[in-house]
Amino acid sequence: MISSGWMQEMEPIPEEGTEADGSEWGAMSDTAKRTMRKKEVYTSEQINTLVSTVPKEAVPQEWLVENQVVDPEMATSYLTESLAGPTSARGSSYSYSYESHYDNPPEEEYEHFTNDDGVHQMQKVTRVTKVTTTRSVRQVPVQSPYSNIDFDSSGLPTPSPVIDRDPSLEMMARMGGASDHDSEDRSAPPPAPASRFLHEDSGIPSAPGVPDVVDAGIGEVTVVWSAPLQSNGGEVRGYQIEMREFPDGEWESMGVDHLLKDTTCRVTNLTSHEVQFRVSAYGRTGFGPASNPSLPVKIPISETDLATSAGAPLAPGRPTVIAVDGQGVLLEWTPPVADVHSSPPQGYQVEYRVYGSRDWIVANEQLVQENVFTVESLRPNGVYEFRVRGKNQDGLGHPSMSSGGVAIRPAAPQRHVPARKVSESVQPPGQPQMVEVGDDVVKLEWAPSVQNARYIVEYREVGDPEWHTANYDPIVQNGIQVEGLHRNSTYEFCVISIVDNIASQPSETSDIIHLRPTCNTSALRPAPNILEAPEFLEVDGDKITICWLPAQSQLPVMGYDVEFRDLQQDDRWYKVNDQPVFACKMTVGDLIMDHDYQFRVLAHNASGCSQPSPPSDFVHIEPSTNRFSSDTMESPHLGHHDVVKYVEAERFGAVPLLQEEMVRESPPLPERDDSPPPLRRANNNVQWRDPSLKEVIEYLSSADKDKQLNASGYLQHLTYTDNQIKEETREYGGIPKLIALLRSDTPRIQKNACACLKNLSFGKENDANKLAVMEADGVRLIAEVLRTTHDASVKEEAAAALWNLSSADMLKPVILESATEILSQQVIAPVLAVGTSDPTRHFGSTLFKNSTGVLRNVSAASQQARRRLRDIPNLIEALVHFLTHAIQKSQVDSPTVENAVCLLRNLSYRIQEVVDPNYDPAAAHSSSSKNMKHVASPKPEKKKKDKEKKKDKNPKNIVTGPSVLWQPHVVKLYLKLLQDSSNIETLEASAGAIQNLAACQFPPSAEVRAAVRVEKGLPVLVELIRLPEDFVVCAVATALRNLAIDPRNRELIGKYALRDFLDKLPEPGSPRRSAISDQTIGAVLGILFEIVRSSAAYTKDVHELKGTDKLRALSRSYPTYSHRVCKYASQVLYVMWQHKELHDGFKRSGLKEADFYSGTARRGDSSTLARPISSQGRERPSMHQLDETLSSGGGYGTMESNNRAGTLRPASATSQTIQRRYDQVPRDGPVYSSVQKPSPRGGGGGGNIDDSWV
């Protein structure tokens, strides 16, 4: 039986041919063709084969894939039944070379054409006469990791999924001169494509960067560009530059005869007045797309057209990116070379642009004096390029070369190291010393502290105040290799000793280490000495345990590699383990019966790898258990079968195999343990071992319920906190099998399956698992388990799995449809039926916590989700009842309270849509602005409130449903949580709920503003402004901003809290305080805007408290602060100047009218600052676009993990939105609103108490 993998069709040997004019070597008439003459042409192809010695009649029918192509990347590893008789399989790769000799020189023509994808490429046609061809074949071992052949436990090859032949995947026959490259034998077949039907390895590079003209002379210019971002499977071999007359001339190639090797070109003999340039890159298989055109360039044609700044600096060195974070880069460059015709630069101008665009943007307002600069406020995940220009008294100099495309990657999330007690009694280790340094890696060693100590290594970039942890799990070796560092940067390191979970003080900081290309610091630190040959500890059937003596090394040994060979297959050595092992023992399994093996060992330290040890004696693998044959250890007869096999080579008949070879790796057992546990022996001499992950997943589909129960329980243990196991479980098909177990009638199996799905879907990094659960209909089946089971523990695990799944935005609609009503009716709503009994046990249950977590996540999904949850009977009443009970019991810091408050806050978002489904925020704002004075004044409402108070005396008039959200007693609950809770997530959500309720222009919002004042909530909120957590301060400040719409609230805030708000503004000339975000500053400016424009007295107080100086400095602080913050500060200054009675005081302070204006800010520009604010905060789904009034950086969907519960808890939402204007309808409606409700109870009343601050 023969199956071919990656078999490529041969290109036909060139035939004889003549030109149309009858001449054998006629001249070419087509100008698009290029003629060359060669003496020899080589073509080669490679074929991979798989040969099995199993008789064809004994092979299962599904294995017969003779006429189909097998994709080696899609090889599976399921078990197959053992076949009778000896079985073997061997894989080989053959390289066929053809050498052609010509009596007359060949003629080669290059034709340019455009393929189906629109890509411009070049095709070569060769015509020769009297060809003599010699073919040679050479067998090469299959070594590519993309073409591994899998075998089952009996040594049989497992079939791979079959795909149709794709002509685009056929190997191109290479024709050219007899160069070393073309005649080189390939040792492995080409890598398999990344997907079955898409061949990404096209060899055609992407478009280069937009070209720039950096220098110009009379009739000539210098053009530079950036290399392509993707080479798509091959190096860029050159560039072609094209030019056209601006604006609509034809593009003309300027490099027909040769490719440009560098990314710069001097173009001469130009006669056009104004031109544009573009560049395309040439890869392995042709030209890629052209870049975008450059900016139009005027060509100097005389001395008068040249630039007059002759003394300007020369171009600085190409800027290098030495650090990248989520929104900025740190650049470094070298100064321009000294020139007698120009003075040195007085400073530098840094410019940047989006990669692929033409316009350069100036990044710095003031000239940079140093050779480093940080460009900030860049778009995360954007690609930019940078350049630098010097400037002196003679003008702006030539620009530097572009840095090339730089991707602005978000900073990697940092994992928090568990807090450990620090004690002076633990001796710190010695100063870490560099052993080896590379581009992005450093190897360190240090003197150990005490005998049983473990070590944590920390590092930081020079200038970074924060230390980062290199290894979160303490290591026992006194050496480490730190990887993934920023290239061309500088670092320092320190080490901490850990003894019995008690940490020492950090060691002395290492010397500063510069990351440079790899170099050894000392030749006196060699690799480990060669080990002695390994010995056999135990042989049992197809498993063998080997051991060896520890290596002798001057540096700590960092692990061992074990290699094996099987002489029945070939004499090459192959690795057993994927990762180095630390123990001096290993059990190797799945060996082939009646084969003879040898083993050898290599040791690693920080300096490198030792030479392989001498090979072990041969060991013969026999079926009998625990037999160790000394005969087979000495000189076993290998039993080669000298039977010549044949492979059918396309069009060339039968070719005998020169050597039969198979690449086969025997992994240790279990597969993922780098020091596998030995076989275990019971008293009755029964032996066993732990199953591998594949075996565990196979057991899930067993018909034996005991195996299902044990396998699902063990898989739950394996998937806990191990992301790689979670990924492999998905890849091995474990998720559909777990979901199938949800239909089991055994509660313990259902519980284990739910727990596994909970672990697999924990964490943002496992979103692929969540999607796999949804695609396998897992959400509906988990919800069905919740509906039908009576087992409380099963319900807890099912709700926990849904909580983790609901953190993914794409699953929220599915969970909303399948599970929210079940959770609400069966878990939350029955709270109201508890009656007089103590509900503490129910409220404190894990099921209640998990259920509120699911609803919390789903409530942030969409407008439809909010409406559906609000309409669930008794849901809102149950949540309010729970919060009331928690406050009475002083249990306000629990995760369940956090979930409930966040859920209520999200349901309060745009709550006016409850009574007005067609609610338009812009229209509502416009109409309310016309009646602003009427809405804010309590006097016109007095009669109406008196009537409603009479109505409230009716005991049957009970408020239910969404109207409960804006009742005064609910607002009082939020204020009580703000006073008593120490959970910052609960604080933020409580403030956000008040913010949302006060954000609209209808009567219930006005009554909420009054209720907060009546309940003495204003000083509670102002007190929280002093907290260090910025996202809490932002939510509180925004809530106060909305409450300040009420005139009396605004007066009280201006009288008692003005100094607190001004303290949040940065001092003039001081560096930025990272602890205060632009959103928080924007909210504070919104409060000041309301206070200042309504009162000259408070405006005077702002000025006397140095607020004017802070606002003036803030309005000119771009780009340190965002453009929006600067604009807000300008608007506050503008309304301050509108109080004409204060002009004299301003002028006595040395200020004039121009100091209160910035740019083009006018009254009409205050539309954004005057808007009330509402938000879902950080829980808003990332798929929803933010309103254009939002400041940058307010990300949503941030998740944090609760390791104790093993579930994913989204962080509470920050209320970060922008205020709505009163005097005009904004161009784009904001994304926030509130709810209408007929007069709530007791919110209002006039009296002195209504105006009291405390």
UniProtKB/Swiss-Prot annotation:
Tell me the GO molecular function terms: cadherin binding
* PROSITE patterns referenced in this protein's UniProt entry, alphabetically: ARM_REPEAT (PS50176), FN3 (PS50853)
Knockout consequence?
Answer: Embryos are viable, but display a partial loss of junctional component, pac-1, from adherens junctions.
> Spans of biased composition, class Polar residues?
145-157, 1166-1176
What is its subcellular localisation?
Cell junction, Adherens junction; Nucleus
Major localization class: other
Q: Subunit notes for this chain? A: Associated with the catenin-cadherin complex consisting of hmr-1, hmp-1 and hmp-2. Interacts with hmr-1. Interacts with picc-1.
Protein name per its UniProtKB record: Juxtamembrane domain-associated catenin
> What organism does this protein naturally occur in?
Caenorhabditis elegans
